[in-house]
């Protein structure tokens, strides 16, 4: 516990808040190129084949990103836009691919929550 005099001399230094999405450099989205597209299995209580992609960003960082929605057209060398947001049951996956932007197509036949999956309004 510091004395009043020590606080007057030094003051308290505010704690640094560690970023949850360090590769974004405080940007809302970042562009990158897929270096590997693959599936992986989630943590213990869940079971599935989750679609993920390793992406090299424009700031030369490599991150693992989740591809949301049913079905995708991504492959190696696809140019994607990513946003922050982790996937709770996939360790190390802290980013999401934005659907319907750049080389990523929107989810086909999507009726609800379309804006999140880049789907156009059905006729």
Curated annotation (Swiss-Prot):
Pfam families referenced in this protein's UniProt entry, alphabetically: Ribosom_S12_S23 (PF00164)
Region (Disordered), start-end ranges: 1-24
A GO CC annotation given for this chain: small ribosomal subunit
BP terms from Gene Ontology: translation
Keywords: Methylation, Ribonucleoprotein, Ribosomal protein, RNA-binding, rRNA-binding, tRNA-binding
Lineage top rank: taxon: Bacteria
Secretion signal, residue range per the UniProt entry: none
GO molecular function term, any single one: structural constituent of ribosome
Ranges of Basic residues composition bias in the record: 9-19
Chain positions found as 3-methylthioaspartic acid: 89
Assembly description: Part of the 30S ribosomal subunit. Contacts proteins S8 and S17. May interact with IF1 in the 30S initiation complex.
Role noted for this protein: With S4 and S5 plays an important role in translational accuracy.
Similarity annotation: Belongs to the universal ribosomal protein uS12 family.
Stated name of the protein: Small ribosomal subunit protein uS12
Species per Swiss-Prot/TrEMBL record: Sphingopyxis alaskensis (strain DSM 13593 / LMG 18877 / RB2256) (Sphingomonas alaskensis)
